[in-house]
Amino acid sequence: MKWVTFISLLFLFSSAYSRGVFRRDAHKSEVAHRFKDLGEEKFKALVLIAFAQYLQQCPFEDHVKLVNEVTEFAKTCVADESAENCDKSLHTLFGDKLCTVATLRETYGEMADCCAKQEPERNECFLQHKDDNPNLPRLVRPEVDVMCTAFHDNEETFLKKYLYEIARRHPYFYAPELLFFAVRYKAAFTECCQAADKAACLLPKLDELRDEGKASSAKQRLKCASLQKFGERAFKAWAVARLSQRFPKAEFAEVSKLVTDLTKVHTECCHGDLLECADDRADLAKYICENQDSISSKLKECCEKPLLEKSHCLAEVENDEMPADLPSLAADFVESKDVCKNYAEAKDVFLGMFLYEYARRHPDYSVVLLLRLAKTYETTLEKCCAAADPHECYAKVFDEFKPLVEEPQNLIKQNCELFEQLGEYKFQNELLVRYTKKVPQVSTPTLVEVSRNLGKVGSKCCKHPEPKRMPCAEDYLSVVLNQLCVLHEKTPVSERVTKCCTESLVNRRPCFSALEVDETYVPKEFNADTFTFHADICTLSEKERQIKKQTALVELVKHKPKATKEQLKTVMEDFAAFVEKCCKADDKETCFAEEGKKLVAASQAALGL
């Protein structure tokens, strides 16, 4: 890359990076501005989500009251932007409103201390008290007729309750995307409550929304963790890699512009600024659709949809075809004598260009692998550009990439072969044993949940052809391991987990993969109550029964970390036979009591406990 070319690109990048797509003049009243931009319906929905994500224990009715008060105030400001308090920031207005809740100290304890702080510290304080695992009752789905009656009696309240229940259980759910889920939720009830067989129509749709919602929440949680724990630079690097894969025909300056604005949108949502986030996301979708000719050939269908569907579609759109005539990367990033000069002039721009060029050529790599390669390249330049002969030093840098690429390729190949051999449930059990031995201090429910989710990588990704396996698998595993990191951060019990979670975002998965059995772990005392079961297990769904069995498996490994595969297999087969036998018995409870004692004794003998 000639020096003059780099300078012109640097100018383009810098202006795009600092400016972005959004052009916002200062407004006298921010709340009036957002109300006018979003409209009353979206404004109220977003304020409800915001309050439910902060005050996760408050009753629905209390939140509705707060939302109505904020909405009436916003209307006052729309009528007269110079009215009293209309010039206050949204953080100030929302924070003041949160602090009026009479039961704040009683319900949330030390979170009430946030109210003594000034902005922006007050909002930061509220954010730190968001609970990823709130103590809320499990959502139980009512009968279909009951739901349809509630939907017809008061559609608005029914949909608000959906937003409220999801938002308070998922305090980082991407708010504009939750509005999209609510649109689909409403459509499902509108269609199915009129169907001949309401349940057959509705239940599969609700199951699909639930599963997609959990996945969407987990993906957004990783984005927020990236911003909160590793900073804006880490998020921008992720966005450069992902958008370059998705839009390989777009120019670097265009990708940079999109990255700047995508970062702004996610920073706002992760920071609780949901009105700004939704408004800016709509502007970004508008910009992408107005400039699709210079971005991607795959956007036309998305851009014809209504706003919420459009934004969702753009976020999920398939990768565009790679340009046919891309030159070798080596010329600009290895062979050129100007590498160190270009790097010294603008390190992040040069690394951003490297990441852009590498990612657009490799849709078959995971984003985290691309970021590992960029980090290796950066480390090499830091070392070599200070050496006596820089070019000689960095000439073989691409050779260092080979083991980094082969490690996830081999791991995915081995695990997909294992998955195809075992099936999902037994593959999950394999991971349960593996991870319990690595980090036995982690709570049993967390180990079960994380290992079950890790095990789903098989059915999610192994069916894909080779070029799509790695981006599917490794980026999915990053999302699941972030769930472990988030849950562990609240109540840390393992230095190994803390180390893998905090040292490097992109190396989390390799760090966990490399962990061996924890030899320092002192096995738990055997407790027969852990393995005592009752007749209620017979009425559980297949999924709930699996979780019961997997919970027992984790406990067995915690009692006997050095148990062999064969020993564990024998015990689990005996357990399955025991459950099957007693669930068929006439007197189930007696069977579970008598046969259960025998099972515990046999398990202890088999494991040498």
Swiss-Prot record:
Binding residues for Cu cation: H27
Subcellular location: Secreted
Signal peptide as annotated in the record: 1-18
Binding positions ((4Z,15Z)-bilirubin IXalpha): K264
Binding-site residues, Ca(2+) 1: E30, E268, D273, E276
Transmembrane spans: none
Gene Ontology, cellular component aspect: blood microparticle; endoplasmic reticulum; extracellular exosome; Golgi apparatus; protein-containing complex
Modified residues (N6-succinyllysine): K229, K460, K543, K588
Chain positions recorded as Zn(2+) binding sites: H91, H271, D273
GO biological process annotation, one example: negative regulation of mitochondrial depolarization
Domain of life of the native organism: Eukaryota
Occurrences of domain Albumin (ranges): 19-210, 211-403, 404-601
Posttranslational mods: Phosphorylated by FAM20C in the extracellular medium.
A Pfam family annotated for this UniProt entry: Serum_albumin
Xref: InterPro entries: ALB/AFP/VDB, Serum_albumin-like, Serum_albumin/AFP/Afamin, Serum_albumin_CS, Serum_albumin_N
Record-listed N6-methyllysine modification sites: K558
Modified residues (Phosphoserine): S29, S82, S89, S297, S443, S513
Propeptide, residue positions: 19-24
Primary location class: secreted
Subunit-structure text: Interacts with FCGRT; this interaction regulates ALB homeostasis. Interacts with TASOR. In plasma, occurs in a covalently-linked complex with chromophore-bound alpha-1-microglobulin; this interaction does not prevent fatty acid binding to ALB.
Protein name: Albumin
Organism: Pongo abelii
Name of the gene this protein is made from: ALB
